């Protein structure tokens, strides 16, 4: 294949949802239908067989995704890159960064609950980029709300038009299949077990045999609903690809009903890799010159090797192993000799990759979130990835002072990942650090990782801070600043000084009583 043909067949998308809507289960079933796994993890439960996309030990224990997973597989002539994101709101920053690497999104909605708070937040991030958003209304094997009501809620709550591509036949125990509006036929499902592919029988709406399958009453109700749908808006693929119209599909990820038709239709409708914006203008994905940006850093994916991977989204051209590339932020040339594609924690060395692909490269400590990698001689930078301002803070120290070395290593590595903000206290060495997070569950993950990955038990105590400001200009030594109660000077791992405040009043006090002090808000950080 030519480079262009390889890029054209790439499909890179994220899966978003509110917690417990079935996002990870749907991801599993995509892998099942794509042939990437022979049996879905859902069937035996978390204890016997953890979900393929949940690789961190704490994820398997708690049954939630707390870090983004990357999975690549082939299906139907497409090369698919799935970005499975944390659904829990406490990990929204990792999700936000992952969405920056996606070309489209699958939004999973619980059919019994409809649009939920985290769904709204994640949808807004996707909408800002105008990427295609596909809706999968899940859990049709349980009692759900009225399908038409659910579509109307998506339109009302999220401000996007919808088009039901298929329509459910019943719900709960009565869920028997879907009507495919494009093929104008019923896809009747037969249960093959949750871990295996569902059987599908295609039958026309006016086929007398349909009554034997679903009964006369349901057949008549379906005919009325199909007629009602026909009076609605027409399908517009261009509107879909510009994020203005969301195709809606119904199914059950748990029973596999409706998953395969959704996957096949989604791959046909969604876009190949989209162009990216840099400080030198839009970068053409079909350019022969390689470029990429770092959207995630993860330490200790393999505890035996104590390694750290930088995840890169390729934005243009073709990546080739052992070729010399340029790291724009450091101004250094480098050879990436062991690039890897991922299936959660499992890896495979690759010799080449194309625009749209996600690769992981070993990071000796030079990469940061948002960094740009190009061909030598090219110095443009892709638009940066902002971080969320921490809302909760704790003072952290090792219980065993003899483990200070392990404590420092763990703190430094986790800080470089960027999902949890860690600050030093000036002139105090590493006796204590201040940890800032968006959601309090991240404290649990930090504590767990420090113990599990670095062997350090922590002493943690809450702090009253609510805001952070970066010191841009200071008229004196920071130690001589007049601080009010509940404020403290901190230092990040780039050596920049910040001030933590207990409230907005404290910010005003500081600038009023320290003439010449100029502070920047968190977005500047």
Question: For each predicted feature, which ranges?
Answer:
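Structural and coupling elements of P-loop NTPases
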Residues: 1-525
């Amino acid at each position: 294949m030519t480079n262009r043909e390889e890029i054209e067949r790439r499909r890179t998308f994220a899966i978003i949802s509110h917690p417990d809507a079935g996002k990870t289960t749907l991801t599993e079933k995509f892998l099942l239908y794509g042939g990437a796994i022979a049996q879905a993890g859902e069937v035996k439960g978390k204890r016997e067989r953890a979900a393929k996309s949940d690789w961190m030990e704490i994820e398997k224990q708690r049954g939630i995704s707390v870090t983004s997973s990357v999975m690549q597989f082939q299906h139907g002539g497409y090369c698919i890159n799935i970005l499975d994101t944390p659904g829990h709101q406490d990990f929204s920053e990792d999700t936000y960064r992952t969405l920056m690497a996606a070309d489209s999104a699958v939004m999973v909605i619980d059919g019994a609950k409809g649009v939920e708070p985290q769904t709204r937040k994640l949808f807004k991030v996707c909408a800002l980029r105008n990427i295609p958003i596909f809706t999968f209304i899940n859990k049709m094997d349980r009692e759900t709300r009225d399908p038409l009501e659910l579509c109307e809620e998506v339109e009302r709550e999220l401000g996007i038009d919808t088009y039901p591509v298929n329509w459910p036949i019943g719900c709960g125990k009565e869920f028997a299949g879907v009507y495919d509006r494009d093929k104008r036929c019923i896809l009747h499902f037969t249960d093959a077990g949750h871990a295996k592919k569902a059987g599908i029988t295609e039958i026309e709406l006016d086929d007398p045999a349909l009554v034997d399958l679903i009964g006369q009453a349901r057949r008549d109700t379906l005919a009325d609903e199909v007629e009602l749908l026909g009076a609605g808006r027409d399908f517009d693929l261009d509107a879909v690809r510009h994020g203005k119209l969301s195709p809606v599909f119904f199914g059950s990820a748990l029973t596999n009903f409706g998953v395969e038709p959704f996957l096949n239709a989604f791959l046909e409708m969604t876009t190949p890799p989209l162009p990216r914006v840099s400080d030198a203008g839009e970068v053409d994905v079909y350019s022969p010159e390689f470029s990429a940006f770092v959207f995630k850093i993860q330490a200790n994916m393999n505890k035996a090797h104590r390694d750290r991977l930088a995840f890169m989204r390729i934005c243009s051209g073709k990546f080739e192993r052992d070729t010399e590339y340029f790291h724009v932020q450091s101004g250094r040339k480098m050879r990436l000799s062991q690039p890897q594609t991922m299936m959660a924690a499992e890896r495979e060395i690759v010799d080449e990759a194309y625009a749209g692909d996600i690769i992981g490269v070993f990071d000796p400590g030079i990469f940061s979130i948002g960094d740009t990698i190009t061909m030598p001689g090219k110095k443009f930078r892709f638009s940066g990835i902002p971080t969320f301002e921490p809302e909760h803070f704790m003072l952290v120290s090792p219980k065993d002072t003899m483990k200070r070395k392990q404590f420092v290593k763990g703190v430094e590595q986790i800080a470089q990942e960027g999902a949890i903000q860690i600050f030093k206290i000036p002139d105090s060495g590493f006796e204590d650090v201040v940890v800032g997070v968006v959601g309090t569950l991240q404290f649990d993950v930090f504590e767990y990782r420090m113990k599990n990955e670095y062997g350090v038990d922590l002493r943690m105590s809450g702090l009253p801070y609510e805001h952070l400001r970066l010191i841009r200009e200071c008229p004196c030594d920071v130690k001589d600043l007049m601080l009010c109660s509940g404020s403290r000077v901190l230092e990040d791992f780039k050596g920049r000084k910040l001030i933590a405040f207990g409230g907005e009043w404290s910010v005003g006090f500081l600038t009023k009583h320290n003439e010449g002090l100029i502070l920047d808000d968190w977005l500047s950080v």
